[in-house]
Amino acid sequence: MKAIYLVIILTFPLHADKIRDFWFNGAEISSFTLSQSRYGKNHPGHAELIFVTEPFLSGKQVKDESGKGDSTDVLKLNSLTTFNTGIYSYHTMTSTFRPTDLEKFPHALKSTTSIQDWCGQAFQQFNFRKNGWNIQVRSYFENVGDKDLVLPSAHLEDEVWITLRLDPKKLPIGETEIIPGAIFTRFNHQPIAAVKANAAFSESGGNRIYTLTYPSLGRILAIHFDTVFPHIIRKWEETTKTGTTTATLNKRMMNVPYWELNKPEDAEKRKEIGLDPVAN
């Protein structure tokens, strides 16, 4: 029993050290070739996943820039997609803030999403509080409008991507309730609510696949990632009743202080991550 107890005690610091050694040295930027299903057709585009750690005030739920207050380290994911549907363009972005201490914090603290196209824009924000998820929705469109609501604690699909990178063993497995991704709910005019899903792991081509199946939505999300830490995301597939969206890893850069690369000559760096010099 003493030996087993010692192994358990040592496991957590070792994994925490791995997280700190890898993730606290600048951002990871990955570009993906996107085929986005929209309006029953597939449209070419690109996607970026930007993972970076930063100090975060767990009370105010904003970046800790003063060095005062209840600060905790989070792994932030900025997930972006860009694609055109015929003549007009779409831009989406989701920012999710997940504490690296998975034992102390059961969920992300915050997740925000914005969608812009030529018709208008929409925004929603999730804040995790003692009473569950506090949600704000703001939209140009009448059938969505402006609303505030509270949902009981449940896993966010948008936090799954970060948990997967930190420790896949912490992901929900089997039948569970998950709040689907914000982009999906907005694109498909779905109510914001926890939905029954089946979560499972599988393997293919030396990689692991984490799959979320939502029977009531007719939707499957499959994320392909490396078996070993840091569990690099290689591709994802989202299948719905109207089509399948795929994103495949193009290029990846580590230890990038992108917030400092803001001069005209730094645009050359965009080529290194597979992006055009001028954003589109």
Give, region by region, the residue ranges found by the protein language model.
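Surface-exposed beta-loop interaction hotspot
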Residues: Q125-T176
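Acidic, serine/threonine-rich low-complexity disordered tracts
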Residues: D17-G132, K169-N280
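Sec-dependent N-terminal signal peptides
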Residues: A3-F12
